[in-house]
Curated annotation (Swiss-Prot):
Residues binding a 1,2-diacyl-sn-glycero-3-phospho-(1D-myo-inositol-4,5-bisphosphate), per UniProt: R8, K11, R25, N30, R63, H73
UniProt lineage: Eukaryota, Metazoa, Chordata, Craniata, Vertebrata
Region ranges (Disordered): 150-266, 281-475, 498-530, 575-608
Family per record: Belongs to the epsin family.
Species assigned in the record: Rattus norvegicus
Domain ENTH: 12-144
Biased segments, Basic and acidic residues type: 214-229, 240-260
Name of the protein: Epsin-3
Chain's gene name: Epn3
């Protein structure tokens, strides 16, 4: 830092100059170089502020009035004024026109230095330029427009350089070359500072300029894309035409794919509901109620839904042999249709209907036996010639058996089954039937038990066993304990639910040891009666009488004056009653009962 710069900073602090004034003093110093453009740009931005504008212009006029020794102050002040007229606020030109006389006096500025060189000529030439600019308004307007465009261009270039420099420094952070490059280019930093907007007006202007440039770039991009529509010079087909030719082909392909998918979905639905073709394989239908052997070999012509039979209708009988198991599935045609209808076949193995009435079937060695089914009675003679379906839930028919069992079966009422398993809980009781010559009892028949309980006169009674029969003649000398122990008499009760149980004893077993309480007659005979002498009852001494507060006083102990007079009304007056005596005699109770104590009741408690 030079001596002049240090002296200038001290003056700024002593005179308490503002920021705008300090910048003007820095731009118009006595240094042998001109004012920096960045500093002049900041001062020009400050002129848009009213307060800063007054400070800037006041310091400029002070610099213009310096003496010849400080000719650099005057020359730099004129240079700054020229810059403010072109890039600053319009009020700068108005104020300069108002103070035009001060500027004109500088045309005669004279100063010759020690070397004899005229330094005033520079000031005079600069004053002429400023005066010509102030007098020609059209030129001033053109100069302002050109200066603003140049400033905006420099600001954009500075922003681009600054952003590139910042991006490069971010990418190369940590490398020593980044620090050297940043430190070795102070011009980039000054341009960046110059490009930054200092006021709101400049910022708005830069924003509008950026929008215009972006709009122009967008238009250029649209023109470059539109250039594909024009044919090229070598006769090749443009890309836009090829793209338009490919669009209908793509649409046709999409339509064909949609049509194929729709047709395939319709065919899938038709396949689901249509019956599957018959294949000569084992029966593997997924339908649990699918009856085998009823699948047509060929589909009826005309439609996929041919005439079919009701799966719940009775199945016609065939000529082939039948099975005794109702749920056996014969190996027949396979089907993938779970709920399809099955037409009736004219020929084939018959299907056993579990719900149809049964008929006599011939006994065949190859017939399967159902362990859970009822016994089947078959005949040795096949008079009918054809086998009929077997019903496991139907009643068995007559069969060839001995004459005795047949007669016993015919003796039963009509509708009753001789089978011991079949029992009608709601029917009348039927006599038991004989099987193989032996009388068979029913499950719920209690007649046998009744016959065993009731003694028939024709039968010999079973002898009852006694101790004599078991011990012999020596049993007569034994003591019979049953005769010694007497059972307590049962109290007669009307409770029907206590029959057969030991009746409760009428006496309290827990009060056997207590003495009986005196009866009312005993208490009456023991208490003194009316009209007895005050000495006490006859035969009872006075010394044996005790006082009891719970018993009333005897009438003989009440004085004669204590009786109520006849003149006392419902509401007695004061003094109607005699005052109570001072001492009342004690009531007398007999200490010993004149009647002897009652004998204790004989308790019948078996636990005492």
């Amino acid at each position: 830092m030079t001596t002049s710069a240090l002296r200038r900073q001290v003056k700024n602090i002593v005179h308490n100059y503002s920021e705008a004034e300090i910048k003007v003093r820095e731009a118009t110093s006595n240094d042998p170089w001109g004012p920096p453009s960045s500093l002049m740009s900041e001062i020009a931005d400050l002129t848009f502020n009213t307060v800063a504008f007054a400070e800037v212009m006041g310091m400029v006029w002070r610099r213009l009035n310096d003496s010849g020794k400080n000719w650099r102050h005057v020359y730099k002040a004129l240079t700054l004024l020229d810059y403010l007229l072109k890039t600053g606020s319009e009020r700068v030109a108005h104020q300069c026109r108002e103070n035009l006389y001060t500027i004109q006096t500088l045309k005669d500025f004279q100063y010759i230095d020690r070397d004899g060189k005229d330094q005033g000529v520079n000031v005079r030439e600069k004053v002429k330029q400023v005066m010509a600019l102030l007098k020609d308004e059209e030129r001033l307007r053109q100069e302002r427009t050109h200066a603003l465009k140049t400033k905006e261009r420099m600001a954009l270039e500075g922003m681009g350089i600054g952003s590139g420099q910042l991006g490069f420094s971010r990418r190369s952070r940590g490398s020593p070359s980044s620090y050297t490059s940043a430190s070795s280019s102070p011009r980039y930093a000054s341009d960046l500072e110059q490009a930054r907007p200092q006021t709101s007006g400049e910022e708005e202007l830069q924003l509008q300029l950026a929008l215009a440039m972006s709009r122009e770039e967008a238009e250029k991009g649209g023109r470059s894309w539109k250039g594909d529509d024009f044919p090229v010079a070598n006769g090749a087909e443009p890309a836009g035409q090829r793209r338009r030719d490919r669009e209908p082909e793509r649409e046709e392909r999409k339509e064909e794919e949609k049509l194929k998918t729709s047709q395939s979905s319709i065919l899938d639905l038709a396949d689901v509901f249509a019956p599957a073709p018959a294949l000569p394989s084992t029966h593997c239908s997924a339908d649990p109620w699918d009856i085998p052997g009823l699948r047509p070999n060929t589909e009826p012509s005309g439609s996929s839904w041919g005439p079919s039979a009701d799966p719940w209708s009775p199945v016609p009988s065939g000529n082939a042999l039948s099975r005794s198991q109702p749920w056996d599935l014969l190996p027949t045609l396979s089907s993938s249709e779970p709920w399809g209808r099955t037409p009736v076949l004219p020929s084939g193995p018959p299907i056993t209907d579990p719900w149809a009435p049964s008929s006599p079937t011939p006994k065949l060695p190859s017939t399967g036996v159902d362990p859970w089914g009822a016994s089947v009675e078959t005949s040795n003679t096949s008079a009918l010639g054809g086998a009929s379906p077997f019903d496991p839930f139907a009643k068995p028919l007559e069969s060839t058996e001995p004459m005795e069992s047949r007669d016993s079966a015919q003796a039963l009422p009509k509708g009753k089954s001789p089978s011991p398993v079949e029992l009608d809980p709601f029917g009348d009781s039927s006599p038991s039937c004989k099987q193989n010559g032996v009388k068979e009892t029913e499950a719920l028949d209690l007649g046998v038990l009744g016959e065993a309980l009731t003694q028939q006169p024709g039968k010999e009674a079973r002898p009852c066993r006694t101790p004599e029969s078991f011990l012999g003649p020596s049993a007569s000398s034994l003591v019979n304990l049953d005769s010694l122990v007497k059972a307590p008499l049962a109290a007669r009760t009307r409770n029907p639910f206590l029959t057969g149980l030991s009746a409760p004893s009428p006496t309290n077993p827990f009060g056997a040891g207590e003495q009986g309480r005196p009866t009312l007659n005993q208490m009456r005979t023991g208490s003194p009666a009316l009209g007895l002498p005050p000495g006490g009852p006859v035969g009872v001494p006075l010394g044996s009488m005790t006082y009891s507060a719970s018993l009333p006083l005897p009438l003989s102990s009440v004085p004669v004056g204590a009786t109520l007079p006849a003149s006392v009304s419902v509401f007695p007056q004061a003094g109607a009653f005699a005052p109570p005596p001072a001492s009342l005699p004690q009531p007398l109770l007999p200490t010993s009962d004149p009647v002897g104590p009652l004998p204790p009741q004989a308790g019948t408690n078996p636990f005492l």
